[in-house]
Amino acid sequence: MPRVHHSLSNQAFLVLLLFSSIASAAIVEHVLHVKDVVVTPLCKEQMIPIVNGSLPGPTINVREGDTLVVHVINKSTYNVTIHWHGVFQLKSVWMDGANMITQCPIQPSNNFTYQFDITGQEGTLLWHAHVVNLRATIHGALIIRPRSGRPYPFPKPYKEVPLIFQQWWDTDVRLLELRPAPVSDAYLINGLAGDSYPCSKNRMFNLKVVQGKTYLLRIINAALNTHLFFKIANHNVTVVAVDAVYTTPYLTDVMILTPGQTIDAILTADQPIGTYYMAIIPYFSAIGVPASPDTKPTRGLIVYEGATSSSSPTKPWMPPANDIPTAHRFSSNITSLVGGPHWTPVPRHVDEKMFITMGLGLDPCPSNAKCVGPLDQRLAGSLNNRTFMIPERISMQEAYFYNITGVYTDDFPDQPPLKFDFTKFEQHPTNSDMEMMFPERKTSVKTIRFNSTVEIVLQNTGILTPESHPMHLHGFNFYVLGYGFGNYDPIRDARKLNLFNPQMHNTVGVPPGGWVVLRFIANNPGIWLFHCHMDAHLPLGIMMAFIVQNGPTRETSLPSPPSNLPQCTRDPTIYDSRTTNVDMSY
């Protein structure tokens, strides 16, 4: 009898817990107006597309468990999608916002509503345009706090402060599609260039602090093409999360963020009352390519309460722009917070193993054209010697859902077509080397069974020049089991992989001339993009996509698309049924 009573008590407790969980969730609604607006971060007026009249765009605040509803109204002259960078999109792949992958774009004078649940995630993420180069000016912070009543796994800070780092060009964003992309004119902190640049000396981000208080810095690298070092003069910070995954607290005086990465770090105002610079500088990782000699730090200010206005700010010592050891030391020392909120152990059994080479290459110069790349060709990029071609007639997700052929091929290779000394490319290449320099152009995907564990060795190559590539996976976090330089050794290096508390990311920088080992569980059906997060490399084709098949239940299967999903084609027969079986290869 007591056992029955105990069971009933458990049932009552579970019902109460479920009710409490539902009651704590909310529907959070926003409207994003995309318009072309004139702004002047430096000396020159520039017409750019921005959201709700601000650069960066509005910060979106939610709690874990909430439903986010965002109405995007496109009043700009550009096609637009919004990607929710790092959000899992469980059962909502149609809301991922990857242009021509999960949806066709929102065309000018049109609108679309994104709606999805925030499940199993806490921390700082970002939202941004996912049409090439529009991310430069269409972006903002997405902050996910714990459910009501649940604390952070660290002492509550006095204040939370978003810091968004940006890259600025005094030119039309359409020109950024050139190969290679033009060099940026400045970097910004929360939309301000600071005192290193003309015409902006009085426009600098200021963070006012109280001595002895702690501040949670929610740091986002929204720069289009550049890794960034970040430092605060005379202050250390404690990293507590990366890519919205809690970490073992890590004390450091310098951080590096790849494009698309986020860091949550606690700053303690523990220095004498005064004024201190915070600064960012670009990290130039390309081996053999000298860093720009006129690289300027972009600065903001930490101003202590009681500081006199006449005092000169203390300057930080910044690492050299090509300081690979400092970048690697920071990136490789982060570990996950074992037992923390949403932590899960590393799966030991692996179902799919892939070895993916990555890097730059060449694309034949069109006849009657002048190309400025090496050997008078156009720059290209590839994964396993495949240059990814983005579809133009219909999104890949729709093609998959409606069984439309001719849009992509299910043949992305698990291995590169040729084994060679990946990190040391010959100065006088052989015929086979030349083949590797001119990758195949194809829209390739890799199909994975639902709930499979996938392990990927990402090997950077020295074709043209090795540089760090920030690889971003949509729809999942992945375990980063190890980093290294040189060619990955499947015996020696595999023994050193961290299977206990590896860091987890949605975006990771592959070291120049080195490798990274990733592992993730494919538990989210749909088509998910995997690509370099330097936008200059998107048109070069450093990307591929995974198709995760349906699971055994309705809850683990791909949902139908929303009725108002933007369409690329006016042909209504394509959308009649899931067995349309149209061929769009023409």
Curated annotation (Swiss-Prot):
Cu cation 3 binds at H130, H474, H531. Cu cation 1 binds at H83, H472. InterPro entries: Cu-oxidase-like_N, Cu-oxidase_2nd, Cu-oxidase_C, Cu-oxidase_fam, Cupredoxin, CuRO_1_LCC, CuRO_2_LCC, CuRO_3_LCC. GO terms for cellular component: apoplast. Glycans are attached at N52, N74, N79, N111, N236, N333, N385, N403, N451. Gene3D superfamilies: Cupredoxins - blue copper proteins. Cu cation 2 binds at H85, H128, H533. It is an enzyme of class 1 (oxidoreductase). Transmembrane segments: none annotated. Lignin degradation and detoxification of lignin-derived products. Belongs to the multicopper oxidase family. This is Laccase-9. The gene is LAC9.
